[in-house]
Amino acid sequence: MMLRWSGIWGLSPPRIFPSLLVVVALVGLLPVLRSHGLQPSPTANTIRGAEPPRERSIGDVTTAPSEPVHHPDDRNLTNLHIEHGAKTLRKAFPVLDIDYLHVRTPFEISLWILLACLMKIGFHVIPTISSIVPESCLLIVVGLLVGGLIKGVGETPPFLQSDVFFLFLLPPIILDAGYFLPLRQFTENLGTILIFAVVGTLWNAFFLGGLLYAVCLVGGEQINNIGLLDTLLFGSIISAVDPVAVVAVFEEIHINELLHILVFGESLLNDAVTVVLYHLFEEFANYDSIGISDIFLGFLSFFVVALGGVFVGVVYGVIAAFTSRFTSHIRVIEPLFVFLYSYMAYLSAELFHLSGIMALIASGVVMRPYVEANISHKSHTTIKYFLKMWSSVSETLIFIFLGVSTVAGSHQWNWTFVISTLLFCLIARVLGVLVLTWFINKFRIVKLTPKDQFIIAYGGLRGAIAFSLGYLMDKKHFPMCDLFLTAIITVIFFTVFVQGMTIRPLVDLLAVKKKQETKRSINEEIHTQFLDHLLTGIEDICGHYGHHHWKDKLNRFNKKYVKKCLIAGERSKEPQLIAFYHKMEMKQAIELVESGGMGKIPSAVSTVSMQNIHPKSMASERILPALSKDKEEEIRKILRSNLQKTRQRLRSYNRHTLVADPYEEAWNQMLLRRQKARQLEQKMSNYLTVPAHKLDSPTMSRARIGSDPLAYEPKADLPVITIDPASPQSPESVDLVNEELKAKVLGVNRDPTRLTRGEEDEDEDEDGVIMMRRKEPSSPGTDVFTPAPMYSPSSQRIQRCLSDPGPHPEPGEGEPFIPKGE
């Protein structure tokens, strides 16, 4: 039976071992919790709930309850004295003791993290499940099972508190997204992202709030008392796309970069709109009447929240970059500054009710180029993997606690309100994407196709941010908050399970372009930067200031001022690819000397000596070792930063101040003549003849010979070579009629007086061009193809250097082709 079950599911005992281990650990922990009377309170400020009041005495390492309870057989009483006459008996020292309250908090946190990690391992070792169901769905199911198990044994399941989510679980995910944000794709599509994030979120919030208010008016007695302000607050919570859910789903389907950055960028930037609307409607709930000034201040607060969060992030990013200048002697603490300054930016933004997500993104984007230029490669690797690990664990815990909190929370169900909420969310998303895309495509060069619009609309997933904001609602001002929370959980489960599970087959069905898995080559990087500089120059010439122009201005300012302040030492200057090459060569030479292989290399490098070192039998192996990923990444960084400075070495110009150099034309003509002479000498040395070439005449095409042979009139001051076309019997035969020129070209001059080249030859070869003319027949009856009697065809057979004579004529064709001049 076990073999049949394993064969059906494709599982083996090693694969199910992590899951069984987690189940055994949970089942074993529950009796311990029950025996010690640990009842986590759902109203606690932490995940596990509030602890009983405890007091700590001065100088003590451990804590003790304020009111200790004494038991008759308590083993912790080590100073128990039993007097029996004059003799005092003392109880033995306890070898083993249990104090769970002392380690309760870190133990439970570690257990939940261990559960999250083991669940991720278990999902990925079972490909039949992970290929069909997204990881986020499986984690929510695990949370539901764990919550039901805890509730089944009589315990209170832990609840995902909003403070824990916003202060501890959300920042690692946003920092990872902001620090490794693909900046090029993000900036190129920033306008589209802002329209979807701002206008789209506002449309969803007010459209959903207005329709739900109309439903509440006619929905029955249970929801008749829900006002317009309540539905608008609920609409602002449920309308925002969640970045955690988007990251979890879109990274598994490997969608192309454009769609990924549009949906993910929208989920990041709509936080400012969500925060403003939430606090705005929450404040309006305390007012008796709302005036025009209140609405205007609420509109102004949007810019304050968004731009204030960006400003806080930029300030902390600059401070982090400046601090990294002085960490060259203490490399161990370099990664710590990145985490601390980013987290301080988030907390500072939340302190003033600004957008903490915008602050984290801004700090990560600003600090990354300068910090990576200052820190070591090992520190960069540490930052990369720690952020990935931290964000992955936080994301896993969030989805698990969504399932646990669903079991632990109090719910209120109303079919009309919940189904209307789900239906209106889908309608608002589809209408918003269609209308906004129609407007955006009027200004985009790369249009968004109907397939792209469908993926954008279908990828609007909701997640833990909406759940946490719904949990923060005050029951005093919003008495139907339990109904709102139930509707939020329903929408989250529908988007994560239904849309998240079906988006992968839909992407395959629609043949949507996938993400390029391999990195771009260095050649592609060079050509991309080349096109950027080309477009910048075109914008300058045309007088049109697009984003390439402002990007170039920002790069110039960055190089002139910012880099000198934030990057230490010589690294603040322009990095050179040649310097990196010398560094790499020096490292290889040192390794070669240390390995003792220097004596095998001869002092004089030649082709023969290199062949002796590397025999022909090893020709298939590469002489030079392949570049490692680290070196290739460093070359990419050098090229990115170095190619941005190419235009700065040129003098400034525009279309109105073009000054011609008087010596430039003469210099170019001289260089051109030298180049022509060099090419002519090379052809003479290779083919022992002169290519018949006339620049002023049109190119001879492969036309068939008619009654009259084709001829071109040469210049009077140029020598003439008359050429007989090749006969069908000897297609390689060429008749050079001018014998003196032939001897001059071949270096076989029969006249001793013409051995030296005189002024007449220099005049003839002034331009380094030899003119060509076809031989005219002496009489109408003379055959054009008959060679002169004084020259035999075999003596005139030379290598074909003039042109390709073309294919042999077909059997039915008696007319050969005219050779085309090179």
Curated annotation (Swiss-Prot):
A family per Pfam: Na_H_Exchanger
Regulation affecting activity: Activated at acidic pHs. Inhibited by amiloride and 5-amino-substituted derivatives. Inhibited by cariporide and eniporide. Phosphatidylinositol 4,5-bisphosphate (PI(4,5)P2) and phosphatidylinositol 3,4,5-trisphosphate (PI(3,4,5)P3) bind and differentially regulate SLC9A1 activity.
Region (Interaction with TESC): 507-549, 637-822
Region Interaction with PPP3CA, annotated ranges: 688-691, 719-724
Entry keyword set: Antiport, Calmodulin-binding, Cell membrane, Glycoprotein, Ion transport, Lipoprotein, Membrane, Palmitate, Phosphoprotein, Sodium, Sodium transport, Transmembrane, Transmembrane helix, Transport, Ubl conjugation
Modified residues (Phosphothreonine): 607, 756, 786
Protein's recorded name: Sodium/hydrogen exchanger 1
Species whose genome carries this gene: Cricetulus griseus (Chinese hamster)
Organism phylogeny: Eukaryota, Metazoa, Chordata, Craniata, Vertebrata
